[in-house]
Regions:
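Early-domain small/polar-rich strand-loop-helix modules and first-structured segments
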Residues: 1-46
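Phosphate-binding glycine-rich loops and adjacent basic patches that engage nucleotide phosphates
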Residues: 25-40, 67-73, 102, 166, ...
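Nucleotide/phosphate-binding catalytic cleft detector across ATP-hydrolyzing
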Residues: 46-162
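Gly/Thr-rich phosphate-binding beta-strand-loop-beta motif of the actin/hexokinase/Hsp70
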Residues: 1, 6, 28-33, 147-174
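Acidic-enriched, low-complexity/disordered segments with a strong bias for Aspartate over Glutamate
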Residues: 13-17, 26, 43, 61-64, ...
């Protein structure tokens, strides 16, 4: 399975018609953080779907692209080879407000739960353990990961100076 820039590059290299191009929604992060952005998708059959801005999506809307994205991530994560995971931590771009973070957590919870096997979903004792919560911002999460990876653990009176440049979907955070 290819992810991120490698997947996008392969996808765009292999597009041979505009139907495939316009049926692809590749700006989820930007759409989620824009209050008045309405997105129009055209599927391969030519059907047009107009999405409200992410914060204005309701259960009456056709679908939630973030929930669908979380579902596919869940299918990749939760399988026979990897096992089943019930605890998730999401990191967010620095400029995402509390409302967007809460909505993203809800979308991810619905999508990830849909990716779980029915036997897990129907077992109230197991599904009760399912949790998803907001962690650190993306740059802070990377810094924590890097410190752990390189075995850098400061003493209580010691400081480790570092810089993280996060070149994201339309922003650069430091």
């Amino acid at each position: 399975v290819l992810v991120s820039h490698e997947a996008a590059s392969k996808f765009y290299d292999e597009i041979d018609d505009e139907k495939s191009y316009y049926a692809t929604f590749n700006e989820l992060k930007q759409w989620a953080n824009t209050k008045n952005r309405h997105q129009i998708l055209i599927d391969k059959s030519g059907n047009r779907v107009k999405l409200n801005s992410y914060l204005n999506l309701t259960s009456k809307d056709t679908f939630d692209p973030i929930e669908l994205y979380a579902y596919y991530l869940g299918l990749y994560i939760n399988n026979y080879n990897n096992g089943i995971y019930l605890h998730y931590t999401l990191s967010f771009p620095v400029n995402y407000g509390v409302k967007i973070q809460e909505k993203l957590l809800n979308s991810f919870e619905r999508g990830l739960k849909k990716s779980l096997p029915p036997t897990i979903l129907s077992d109230s004792n197991i599904i009760e353990e399912f949790e998803i919560y907001a962690g650190a911002s993306e740059p802070a999460a990377y810094a924590i990961s890097a410190l752990e990876t390189y075995g850098l653990e400061p003493n209580s009176n010691e400081e480790i100076e570092y810089g993280v440049f996060d070149f994201g979907g339309g922003t650069t955070d430091f």
